[in-house]
Amino acid sequence: MFKLTSRLVTSRFAASSRLATARTIVLPRPHPSWISFQAKRFNSTGPNANDVSEIQTQLPSIDELTSSAPSLSASTSDLIANTTQTVGELSSHIGYLNSIGLAQTWYWPSDIIQHVLEAVHVYSGLPWWGTIAATTILIRCLMFPLYVKSSDTVARNSHIKPELDALNNKLMSTTDLQQGQLVAMQRKKLLSSHGIKNRWLAAPMLQIPIALGFFNALRHMANYPVDGFANQGVAWFTDLTQADPYLGLQVITAAVFISFTRLGGETGAQQFSSPMKRLFTILPIISIPATMNLSSAVVLYFAFNGAFSVLQTMILRNKWVRSKLKITEVAKPRTPIAGASPTENMGIFQSLKHNIQKARDQAERRQLMQDNEKKLQESFKEKRQNSKIKIVHKSNFINNKK
C-alpha cells in the first residue's frame, strides 16, 4: 500500500516537473528592443559624465547670451530696414502701371500723365512726391513759351482797350446785319494794325485738360494704391494715399492761387477788375473744405502748380525779362471812350447780374439779326422771281390776238 502511494506521488512529481520544463521551453524570448528600451530607461537615471561635459561646452552661458543681445537687435533692425527698402521696388520698372490696369492708352489725358509720371519716377529715381513735383515743373516749363505769347497779346490789347471796348459794344448792340459786318471789319483792322492775334489768348486754356489729367491720374494711383505711394511722401504727409490731416497743402494751394491772381494772372499782364479780384480771392478759400478729403498726391500737384504760377507771374512781370523776350509792356489804364460800359465800381453780384443781362440782350439781338437776314433773303428771292423775263411764243401771241 505504501509502495503504491509512493509510486503515485513519484509519478505526479515527475509529470509536474516535465510540465514545468515544457512551459519553460514554450515561453518566448524577450525582444532585443525591449531590452534596449529598458536599458535606455535605466541609463537616463544615471547619465554619462562625457555626455554632460559635451552638452555644457555646446550650450552658451548667460553672459554670452547677454553680450550677443545688441548684435541680435542690430540684425533685426537691418532686416526691418531691408524689408522697408523693398517697398516701392515694384514701381521702379517701366510697365508697372500698365500691369495693374493704369496707363492703358496714349491718347487719354490721365493715361498720358501716368506714362510721364512713371518715366520720371523710373529714370530719375525720385520718390513719388518728388516725381509729382518734377513732372509738374517739367510740363509747366514746356508750356512757358505759350504763356510768353499770351502775355504779349494781352499787353498789346491793353494799348487799344478803350477803342476795342467801344467797337465790341457797337457790335453787340447793333441789330442791322450790314452795320454789324462793318463794325466787325473795323475791329479786325484795328487788331491787325497792332499785330494782335487773339488765338494766343487761348494758350492758358491748355492748362485745363492737363490739370484734369493730373487730377484723374493721381486720384486713381492713390486709390489703387500704387506701390510706394503709402510711404514716399515728405514732411507731415508721408502717405500720399491719405488726405492731409492738417490741411496744410490746401492752405498753401489757396494762398498761391490768391497771390498769382493779385499779381496779374499767369501771364503777368492781365488787369482784373475789382469784382473779379474779390471773386478770385473767395474761390480759393472755399476750395479748402472742398478739397479736404482729396488724397495728398492730388493736392500736392495743385500746390506745386500754383507755386510755379506765382513764380511765372513774377518772371513775366519783370521789365528786364520782358525786354529780353520782346514782350510788349502793359499800358496803364486809360479813361474809357464813349460807348464803353465799365463795371469797375460794381460788386460781385452786380457784375454777375450785369453780365447775365448783357448775354441775354446779346442773344435777343442775335435772334433779331437772324430774323432780319431771313426777311432780306425772302425779299431778294421775290425780286429775283419778278425780274425774270417772260418768253412768249408767236403762236400764243396769234391765238390771243384772235
Curated annotation (Swiss-Prot):
Q: Name one GO molecular function term.
A: mitochondrial ribosome binding
Q: Where are the transmembrane segments?
A: 119-139, 200-220, 240-260, 276-292, 298-316
Result of knocking out the encoding gene: Leads to reduced steady-state levels and activities of the mitochondrial ATP/ADP carrier protein AAC2.
Q: Where in the cell is it found?
A: Mitochondrion inner membrane
Impact noted for substituting Y301D: Leads to respiratory deficiency
Q: Tell me a GO biological process for this protein.
A: protein insertion into mitochondrial inner membrane
- In chain numbering, the transit peptide falls at 1-42
Please list the residue ranges that the record places on the Mitochondrial matrix side of the membrane.
140-199, 261-275, 317-402
- Tell me what the record says results from W129R: Leads to a defect in complex V assembly and subsequent respiratory deficiency
Give any Gene Ontology cellular component. Answer: mitochondrion
Question: Does the keyword section mention Secreted?
Answer: no
Give the protein's recorded name: Mitochondrial inner membrane protein OXA1
What organism does the record attribute this protein to?
Answer: Saccharomyces cerevisiae (strain ATCC 204508 / S288c) (Baker's yeast)
